[in-house]
UniProtKB/Swiss-Prot annotation:
InterPro entries: NAD/GMP_synthase (IPR022310), NAD_synthase (IPR003694), NH(3)-dep_NAD(+)_synth (IPR022926), Rossmann-like_a/b/a_fold (IPR014729)
UniProt-recorded name of the protein: NH(3)-dependent NAD(+) synthetase
EC number(s) from the headed UniProt entry: 6.3.1.5
Protein's pathway: Cofactor biosynthesis; NAD(+) biosynthesis; NAD(+) from deamido-NAD(+) (ammonia route): step 1/1
Organism lineage string: Bacteria, Pseudomonadati, Pseudomonadota, Gammaproteobacteria, Enterobacterales
UniProt subunit comment: Homodimer.
UniProt binding sites for Mg(2+): D52, E165
Length: 275
């Protein structure tokens, strides 16, 4: 088995999908989890205005709607969380995403004050954060807020990780990667677009250039620039297609060096890191 085949198998990626079937699969997955653990009353998700959180948010709200209708349990809710750092450049996209999702509840937590306070406390301890590390601080502050909200609403935190993100480890460890349940896991980027199109999402929310937008020195840096490969390249690779050798090498290097991000903390029983 080639490394490409191993990666595809590990991430559960498929070369083709039926959008309606995958929508139903994710909704039923979320409903099944909530029904298995009836003490869970809320799904909590940060909404950025990008493709992934828009899709995950819509699926969460659909799952909650169906479960409320089936059980009559009005205490179930989906909580969409806006987590800007100061003023977000694409705030209108966030509002458009929320209008599309129609969440039960919307909370806004501006993380800038908390991030600056943490940075100052570290500075006083003799640690000056680089712009890149400050970006990770933002991602972790966002997740901290979501877990606080989940803790106070008997909820779980929903993630947006999918195959095209997992393969490169393009997420912050214990930031946006630190979630409870990931309904998009298995899909690549273009497949996520297919689901949103089937759901009637405004096109500009899934045709915009994806960006983590964590660095102050490089605001709205496109993911594809940071990664050195395009999402079309990554999607082709995950669909088992032949890609240029340099593209395959770049993707595989990302996969191998970020393996620790896709695993629990390393213990004496692990040996994957010895390769």
């Amino acid at each position: 088995m080639t490394l490409q085949q191993q990666i595809i198998k590990a991430l559960g990626a498929k070369p083709q999908i039926n959008a309606e079937e995958e929508i139903r699969r994710s909704i039923d997955f979320l409903k099944s989890y909530l029904q298995t653990y009836p003490f869970i009353k809320s799904l909590v998700l940060g909404i950025s205005g990008g493709q992934d959180s828009t899709l995950a948010g819509k699926l969460c709200q659909m799952a909650i709607n169906e479960l409320r209708q089936k059980t009559g349990n009005e205490s179930l809710q989906f909580i969409a969380v806006r987590l800007p750092y100061g003023v977000q450049a694409d705030e209108q996209d966030c509002q458009d995403a929320i209008a599309f999702i129609q969440p039960d509840r919307v909370l806004t937590v501006n993380i800038k004050g908390a991030v600056l306070a943490s940075e100052q406390a570290l500075r006083e301890a003799g640690i000056e954060l680089s712009d890149f590390v400050r970006g990770n601080e933002k991602a972790r502050e966002r997740m901290k807020a979501q877990y606080s909200i989940a803790g106070m609403t008997s909820g779980v935190v929903v993630g947006t990780d999918h195959a095209a993100e997992a393969i490169t480890g393009f997420f912050t460890k214990y930031g946006d990667g630190g979630t409870d349940i990931n309904p998009l896991y298995r899909l690549n980027k273009r497949q996520g677009k297919q689901l949103l199109a089937a759901l009637g999402c405004p096109e500009h929310l899934y045709k915009k250039a994806p960006t983590a937008d964590l660095e102050d020195d490089r605001p709205s840096l496109p993911d594809e620039v940071a990664l050195g490969v395009t999402y079309d390249n990554i999607d082709d690779y995950l669909e088992g297609k032949n890609v240029p050798e340099q593209v395959a090498r770049t993707i595989e290097n990302w996969y191998l060096k970020t393996e620790h991000k896709r695993r629990p903390p390393i213990t004496v029983f692990d040996d994957f890191w010895k390769k």
